[in-house]
Amino acid sequence: MENQEKPLSVDEEYDLWKSNVPLMYDFVSETRLTWPSLTVQWLPTPVQELDGGFIKQELIIGTHTSGEEENYLKFAEINLPKEILSNEDPQEEAGEEYQSSLPAPRSNIRITAKYEHEEEITRARYMPQDPNIVATINGQGTVFLYSRSEGLQSTLKFHKDNGYALSFSTLVKGRLLSGSDDHTVALWEVGSGGDPTKPVRTWNDLHSDIINDNKWHNFNKDLFGTVSEDSLLKINDVRANNTTIDTVKCPQPFNTLAFSHHSSNLLAAAGMDSYVYLYDLRNMKEPLHHMSGHEDAVNNLEFSTHVDGVVVSSGSDNRLMMWDLKQIGAEQTPDDAEDGVPELIMVHAGHRSSVNDFDLNPQIPWLVASAEEENILQVWKCSHSLPIVGGPPKVNKDIIS
């Protein structure tokens, strides 16, 4: 017993991670926010090179002040070294000052606009067909529509309790799903010219407990998935009278789900038991596979839009994990097996509290923004030297203006 290693404290784990930053990352920025943000999303900002060799990207964040101050929906920008586009090493290009900053991640986030918001923002998501429009949901389940340039536009009331589920369709302009702790799901049409403040359809019987997440399918405009505290995963069709076309009984409640951007049949879901499950929509009776690595509940999932088969997850264990589904079943040496399953390609251990939300940049492969409970927002890109899917992904430099 005396020889047993004492587990590292959270601060010791952070210091260990920080010492490995130059080896594992091309870029890291860390910002301490005044208040924690429960939500983060990249805006689809065109990649433009600025004076000084930087590129600008933009983010949506919120505040959770616990009633102590006014809450705000915020828009932020960050300047990134242009070398991350070509998978070069920014440390080599930016000189001594940048090299010395990597072990102690610096902040270069700047708030460019903010709008007052009724209560905390649990989720904020932009409309894919019009990124000037942003939907939010708060701790009372009220949905709001904001214009980036003009502020609050509409208040959408239906839910009676806290909501975390919010999803715009990538296929139909203005088609918005919201879900709440009151067990209900609502469909809003906010881009059709009608009254956006009244739901076009609501569901009170999809689930018998809290709606943890809902997401639209990326290939079929009428399909959406829901997960709930009732331990059910449901695939639903807005055209069907009974709506639900498939139901999965989960081992424990799922907190999150995500549909692939590359395969119309692939779905991932995860929750309280810490595993990430993969399903084929053509046969949902049993999962295709489950991936182990997290040590606590998984709260968010996202498929890469750039690389087929890459999934990212985040959890209450303060970790984000990148998975390569093409590596499932790959042979490992005993030493490699001790580090994790073969499909686990990257662990981001830079957070010291539960990860509230994260997002993969739609323009720049492997660039991630992640927000944690303890007021920290990080922007990071894993090293191009890591053995990631198909070698380093390329960015089309024609998009740089």
Swiss-Prot record:
WD repeats lie at residues 116-147, 158-189, 206-237, 249-280, 293-324, 350-381. Component of the HAT-B complex composed of at least HAT1 and HAT2. In the cytoplasm, this complex binds to the histone H4 tail. In the nucleus, the HAT-B complex has an additional component, the histone H3/H4 chaperone HIF1. Regulatory subunit of the histone acetylase B (HAT-B) complex. The complex acetylates 'Lys-12' of histone H4 which is required for telomeric silencing. HAT2 is required for high affinity binding of the acetyltransferase to histone H4, for the nuclear location of HAT1 and for the HAT1-HIF1 interaction. Alone, it is unable to bind to H4, requiring HAT1 for high affinity interaction with the histone tail. HAT2 also has a HAT1 independent function in life-span regulation. It is found in: Cytoplasm; Nucleus. InterPro entries: Histone-bd_RBBP4-like_N, WD40/YVTN_repeat-like_dom_sf, WD40_repeat_CS, WD40_repeat_dom_sf, WD40_rpt, WD_repeat_RBAP46/RBAP48/MSI1. Belongs to the WD repeat RBAP46/RBAP48/MSI1 family. It comes from Saccharomyces cerevisiae (strain ATCC 204508 / S288c) (Baker's yeast). Keywords: Chromatin regulator, Cytoplasm, Nucleus, Repeat, WD repeat. Induction: Repressed in presence of farnesol, probably through a intracellular decrease of diacylglycerol. PANTHER family: WD40 REPEAT FAMILY (PTHR22850). The keyword Lipid biosynthesis does not apply. Changing L266E: Abolishes interaction with HAT1. The record marks L266 as: Important for interaction with HAT1. GO terms for biological process: chromatin organization; chromatin remodeling; regulation of DNA-templated transcription; subtelomeric heterochromatin formation. This is Histone acetyltransferase type B subunit 2. One of its GO terms (molecular function) is histone binding. GO terms for cellular component: chromosome, telomeric region; cytoplasm; histone acetyltransferase complex; nucleus; Rpd3L complex; Rpd3L-Expanded complex. Residues 335-339 are annotated as: Interaction with the histone H4 N-terminus. The gene is HAT2.
